[in-house]
Regions:
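Soluble, acidic/polar mature domains that operate outside membranes
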Residues: 1-520
Length: 520
């Protein structure tokens, strides 16, 4: 115990001694600082205080990040040296013969200049010299120096990328030289169509469409590059690598005072229209819906009221249609890409994030489901296999029990003989839930006759034909109209086996009809 107490006292004494040995080099109240001048990107740069805000002296429009400059000023509030080297003859040993930076602090009392030399990476310290005291070198913590060692746009206040709720995305259009597509949500709100130019639409894979929309919801800026780009060509934005146009929706709260004012203005407008119905309202073509974040809104679509509590208070919201256009330019040095949404401010954005949206063809988003036909709407199924053709007819009958509950009974007949519903739906599920591993985009000519041909007829008398050909050792080609899906050979053979079981082992003359569930 005695030894431990001694060691603890010794450590405490050493720590206290180190604190006492620190030498104050400079102190200032941050509120007294009028300007800071230091080198940024090899240029002398001055930030000065005007009306309690930092501005860039030679470029007052520059969007200075006030927090960053306040932090830099705070680093000088009390500059202390861990060591003081006096009577230094050779400044080259400390990198002070040609300083990497210099920081000049101006107050009402005058100016103080610090030259910054080399960094001692092993101790996380810098060598600095104050004013023109060339023979004295101070060793200070890196926290005193690093706030002044950044690039210009590290001192800029950028904007956040507009928030997109991926669940509200209605349409995505990507325009590139070769890889362009249009992805559109269907009216059911659950499925998507994809095309190259808006025509010849194909059903989109739900997961692939979800990856695109979730990618949009994840977009964020990396680095702020230019707040007022006059030459977009240096970022490749005069002729963008890709243009992304997103139609989405946003819920906004209505301000009650704004609503009252709007209602009043609307009333006045109606009066004016009644007074002069011949006034020209054709407009000059200017889009008055454009917003500062690069998106446009139309709040005329729909309105909804949401109760916020049980005391009768409610918040009225409006569903606003928005459109955001994102221009994607060249690669930056770090591998990211330059982007802009207003052709003025330029940022970088991760290529990993963008890759969820760009560099895709419409075919990359195609659904690979060969042909889904719900059993609830199936009327007839005709199958030709191994030289024989069999037909399954579906009939439905609704009965009502004593309590008034309706029950639908579905009966399946194979060539006029009733068959077990479970055996049929086992085969049918394998048939309609079949997915290809890829689709051929080039023309296809079968090398042999079809091994199976299936004709679907639904309750609306629509017919679809699916034909299966052996493609190679790994795949069958499932052909639907002009679409050719390559399906794993084992998947197709399992379906063939289920069909053989249906035909060879389960046909029967009579069976009590059973209620069946939807085929998955």
């Amino acid at each position: 115990v005695g030894l431990n107490t001694y060691v603890t006292k010794e450590e405490s004494t050493e720590s206290s001694s180190e604190e006492e040995s620190k030498t104050e080099v400079y102190s200032v109240k941050t509120d007294d600082i009028k300007s800071l001048e230091f080198i940024i990107d090899k240029k002398d740069t001055v930030f000065e205080k005007k009306d309690d805000s930092w501005v860039k002296k030679d470029e007052t429009a520059f969007p200075v990040n006030q927090t960053t400059l306040d932090s830099a000023a705070s680093a000088l509030e009390k500059v202390e040296a861990d060591r003081v080297l006096e009577n230094v003859d050779d400044l080259t040993e400390y990198g002070l013969d040609s300083p990497s930076n210099s920081v000049t602090v101006t107050t009402d009392d005058g100016t103080t200049k610090f030259n910054i030399g080399d960094e001692n990476t092993s101790t996380n310290q810098y060598y600095i010299a104050k004013d023109d005291e060339d023979s004295t070198v101070y060793v200070v913590s890196s926290s005193t120096v690093t706030p002044f060692m950044n690039s210009l746009y590290d001192y800029a206040q950028g904007e956040d990328f507009p928030t997109i709720d991926s669940s509200t995305v209605k349409k995505v259009q990507v325009s590139q030289d070769e890889d362009s597509y249009i992805l559109e949500e269907n009216s059911d709100g659950a499925t998507w169509d994809v095309s190259t130019d808006g025509s010849d639409k194909e059903t989109a894979d739900t997961t692939a469409a979800g990856n695109v929309t979730s990618g949009l919801g994840s977009l964020a800026y990396d680095q702020f590059v230019d707040y007022n780009a006059e030459g977009l060509s240096k970022y490749g934005l005069d002729k963008p690598y890709a243009t992304i146009t997103v139609d989405y929706q946003e819920e906004v709260e209505n301000d009650s005072s704004d609503e009252s004012e709007s209602d009043s203005e609307a009333s006045e407008s109606v009066t004016e229209d009644d007074t002069d119905s011949t006034e020209d309202t054709s407009g000059d073509g200017i889009d008055s819906t454009a917003s500062d974040d690069g998106s446009s809104g139309d709040s005329s679509e729909s309105e909804a009221a949401a109760d916020s509590s049980d005391d009768g208070d409610s918040t009225e919201t409006t569903t606003v249609d928005k459109q955001l256009v994102i221009y994607v330019g060249d690669n930056a040095d770090d591998g990211s890409r330059y982007v802009t949404i207003d052709n003025k401010q330029v940022y970088t954005m991760s290529t990993d994030t963008l890759s969820a949206i760009i560099d895709k063809k419409a075919s990359d988003l195609w659904s690979l489901i060969v042909n889904y036909q719900s059993v609830k709407t199936l009327d007839q199924l005709q199958v030709t296999y191994a030289g024989d053709t069999h037909t399954v007819n579906v009939s439905r009958e609704t009965s009502t029990d004593d309590d008034g509950n309706d029950t639908e009974t579905t009966t399946y007949k194979l060539d006029e003989n009733e068959i077990d519903s479970t055996t049929f739906t086992t085969f049918y599920n394998k048939l309609v839930n079949m997915a290809g591993q890829k689709r051929l985009t080039e023309s296809y000519t079968p090398a042999a006759d079809a091994e199976m041909k299936v004709v679907f007829a639904d309750t609306d008398n629509n017919q679809t034909t699916v034909t299966f050909y052996s493609y190679d050792t790994n795949y069958y080609a499932a052909v639907v109209d002009n679409k050719v899906f390559l399906v794993n050979k084992m998947t197709v053979k399992e379906m063939f086996t289920a069909y053989e079981t249906l035909v060879n082992g389960n046909a029967k003359e009579t069976e009590t009809p059973t209620t069946t569930a939807e085929a998955e």
